[in-house]
């Protein structure tokens, strides 16, 4: 198991807790809204919400991914404003979550509410090699067919 350093930036809510796996099978660690009072998110509005924590991954072959919580999106229309968040190994600032209300009703976010998931992934570091063309013996069935190629 890899150890990731975490620091509490602000602890301004009752029952503040560090990110945790809610069940033994949970892939992501739940991130909480570290806010002092409820925040309204109007339809089509985005709000930047603090989590109260910072992490230092340190290992350049690991990154953090911020993912939405499925229930918030499905039931309330609350999704991540940037669709996915990437935390580089050398970032040490507070983790902030951009929430977007894509729904048609006002959403009230309460202090301590679980708002996103943090997942750690391995990163394959590559070196790009510039070529003028690809080897003709390495042609694939797909080739250059892009979006919708298999429809």
UniProtKB/Swiss-Prot annotation:
Pathway(s) annotated for this protein in UniProt: Pyrimidine metabolism; dUMP biosynthesis; dUMP from dCTP (dUTP route): step 2/2
Cofactor(s) this protein requires: Mg(2+)
Keyword Transmembrane tagged: no
GO biological process, one term: dUMP biosynthetic process
Pfam family, one: dUTPase
Catalysis performed (reactions): dUTP + H2O = dUMP + diphosphate + H(+)
Keywords, comma-separated and alphabetical: Hydrolase, Magnesium, Metal-binding, Nucleotide metabolism
Binding, substrate: 69-71, 82, 86-88, 96
HAMAP family: dUTPase_bact
Protein function: This enzyme is involved in nucleotide metabolism: it produces dUMP, the immediate precursor of thymidine nucleotides and it decreases the intracellular concentration of dUTP so that uracil cannot be incorporated into DNA.
Family: Belongs to the dUTPase family.
Protein name, as recorded: Deoxyuridine 5'-triphosphate nucleotidohydrolase
Organism: Blochmanniella floridana
Lineage per the UniProt record: Bacteria, Pseudomonadati, Pseudomonadota, Gammaproteobacteria, Enterobacterales
Gene name of this polypeptide: dut
């Amino acid at each position: 198991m890899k150890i990731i350093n975490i620091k509490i930036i602000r602890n301004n809510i009752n029952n503040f807790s560090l990110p945790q796996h809610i069940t033994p099978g949970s892939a992501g660690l739940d991130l909480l809204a570290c806010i002092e009072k409820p925040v309204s998110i109007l339809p089509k509005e985005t709000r930047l919400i603090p989590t109260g924590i910072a992490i230092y991954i340190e290992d350049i072959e690991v990154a953090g991914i911020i993912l939405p919580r499925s229930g918030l999106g499905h039931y309330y229309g609350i999704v991540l404003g940037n669709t996915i968040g990437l935390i580089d190994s050398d970032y040490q600032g507070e983790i902030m979550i951009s929430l977007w209300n894509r729904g048609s009703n006002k959403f009230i976010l309460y202090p301590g509410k679980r708002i996103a998931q943090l997942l750690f992934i391995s990163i394959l570091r590559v070196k790009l090699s510039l070529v003028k063309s690809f080897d003709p013996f390495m042609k694939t069935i797909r080739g250059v067919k892009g979006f919708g190629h298999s429809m």
